[in-house]
Amino acid sequence: MIDLKFLRENPDAVRESQRTRGEDPALVDALLEADASRRAAVLAGDNLRAEQKAFGKKVGQASPEERPALLEGSKELAAKVKQAEAEQHEAQAALDAAHRAISNVVQEGAPAGGEDDFVTLETVGDIPAFDFEPKDHLELGESLGLIDMERGAKVSGARFYFLTGFGAMLQLGMLQLAAQKAMANGFQMMIPPVLVRPEIMAGTGFLGAHADEVYHLADDDLYLVGTSEVPLAGYHSGEILDLADGPKRYAGWSTCFRREAGSYGKDTRGIIRVHQFDKVEMFTYCKPEDADAEHQRLLAWEREMLAAIDVPYRVIDVAGGDLGSSAARKFDCEAWVPTQQAYRELTSTSNCTTFQARRLGVRYRDENGKPQTAATLNGTLATTRWIVAILENHQQSDGTVRVPEALVPFVGTDVLKP
């Protein structure tokens, strides 16, 4: 949730953020109205309770003759207090609903527009110039015994797969390398639960416009996570953190689940867009004033991993209309996929400022010992989709694939052969 104090002082900035996202700026006015109504209801209730307290003292000091009339007045006042409390509760519920309808305030400098309006910040590496017709990742994966989509579909349905043999080792090696790099940079490794309570899923912002992307176990009222960002954000919910020595950094290794409800007909071939995949995700809690610098650090660590797998990629500044509701700014790294003649997302890092932490009640103490809302950030360090870029960019004319040098110790071979 956004900071209501910021909203009251900067309503035009929040309206502009809504426009940048392509969302309704009128929601800002609805929130301001709900905020004013709730504050008025609280004031009215407080005044009545103060009056009730003073009236109670008057009753206690009254003579026997005066008391019956005063008691009758006390009953009337009690009824008014009860009504005021009901109105306050109703006003709070309306405020909560209006508050949750507003996405995070887009950071100044982020591009306006939608999915195609990103700004390319840098392009890294040389696009391979093959002297043969390159195969796509699925053809390579099947011919080398790395990917089995047919049996994945037989067992689980469309967009499921088996990683087999060195395909499994390639993923495990990639994730293990990511875990080692995370630990070397001060992250605490975590294997989190992949089922979370509704309040944790909602707190991270995943039950808004894209709620249909999330798997829900209705009988247990639990959600399957699409990223370990969710349980890691909930890890310190309701706590006051000690950030005096700098950010708290966690790296979660988990299986992730996405319904891909809005992706019918898109990327139906191979493992680019699937219902289940594995990922190592970086997650940071820090002071708000440290968030921008931390965002750049997360991006730098992602780039280190992409350098390790030796694929050409570009870094983009994602436009406001393509941001998730929790993100104020997002940078993606997209790798070149030769057979698509296009760049495809491999990593994403988001600065969620205080949006998630405010929902989840994560705070820290400032230099005066006063609790303040923390900032949260996240970023991909490795995920299943990377196999696509590795296979296609490192394929050779004889149908084999060269294993990136950094992954050889984990995979156990330097060339993937039939």
Swiss-Prot record:
Main EC class of this protein?
ligase
**Any one Gene Ontology molecular-function term assigned to this protein's record:** serine-tRNA ligase activity
Residues that bind L-serine, according to the entry? T227, S228, E229, E281, T380
Q: Where in the cell is it found?
A: Cytoplasm
Keywords, A to Z, come to: Aminoacyl-tRNA synthetase, ATP-binding, Cytoplasm, Ligase, Nucleotide-binding, Protein biosynthesis
| Bilayer-spanning residue ranges | none
Which pathway does the protein contribute to?
A: Aminoacyl-tRNA biosynthesis; selenocysteinyl-tRNA(Sec) biosynthesis; L-seryl-tRNA(Sec) from L-serine and tRNA(Sec): step 1/1
Q: What does this protein do?
A: Catalyzes the attachment of serine to tRNA(Ser). Is also able to aminoacylate tRNA(Sec) with serine, to form the misacylated tRNA L-seryl-tRNA(Sec), which will be further converted into selenocysteinyl-tRNA(Sec).
Q: Note the subunit structure.
A: Homodimer. The tRNA molecule binds across the dimer.
Q: What is known of its domains?
A: Consists of two distinct domains, a catalytic core and a N-terminal extension that is involved in tRNA binding.
Q: What name is this protein filed under?
A: Serine--tRNA ligase
Q: What is the lineage of its organism?
A: Bacteria, Bacillati, Actinomycetota, Actinomycetes, Mycobacteriales
